[in-house]
């Protein structure tokens, strides 16, 4: 029953995965997917509302937004007030700064992650400078979106990672 409900095209419109599905360029999908996944906690309606606000700021191409550095004005590095729940404008500045570095040095986030060792989750945590020891459910969801190809929901655009290396974090 779960697969019929959550792994079909009809699910996309009501889920945060709708945002990366709006794009065709790999870099746009990566940026949209990562930032949307990072925000995916709390009330679903609030997640979708705030993710929509973020995507309006980024305009038609998250990739061009990152490269243009407009995020430096929209998300000042010293701004500690909240953008979404406990995520501050400064937090998003840090995410955009890491993405800017990745895209100016590598062709994609996928390529940037490959400089790190370990399974995909460890690589992504190293890139974001967060602990790989916590469950990181949102980041695992992002990796699923990028790596899995066996669902209408997941985008499956990353070729260099194996879906067998994905993990399902459990609450303890």
What does each model-found stretch correspond to?
Residues 1-172:
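HhH-family (HhH-GPD) DNA N-glycosylase catalytic core used in base-excision repair
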């Amino acid at each position: 029953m779960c697969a019929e409900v959550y792994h079909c095209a009809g699910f996309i419109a009501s889920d945060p995965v709708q945002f990366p599905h709006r794009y065709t360029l790999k870099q746009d999908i990566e940026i949209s997917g990562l930032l949307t996944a990072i925000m995916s906690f709390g009330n679903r309606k609030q997640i979708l509302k705030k993710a929509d606000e973020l995507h309006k700021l980024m305009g038609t191409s998250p990739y061009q937004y990152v490269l243009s550095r407009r995020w430096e004005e929209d998300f000042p590095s010293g701004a500690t007030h909240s953008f979404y729940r406990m995520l501050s404008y400064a937090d998003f500045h840090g995410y955009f700064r890491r993405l800017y570095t990745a895209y100016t040095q590598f062709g994609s986030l996928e390529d940037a992650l490959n400089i790190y060792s370990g399974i995909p989750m460890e690589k992504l945590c190293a890139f974001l400078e967060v602990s790989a020891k916590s469950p990181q459910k949102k980041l695992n969801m992002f990796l699923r979106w990028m790596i899995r190809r066996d669902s209408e929901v997941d985008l499956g655009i990353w070729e260099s990672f194996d879906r067998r290396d994905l993990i399902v974090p459990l609450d303890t």
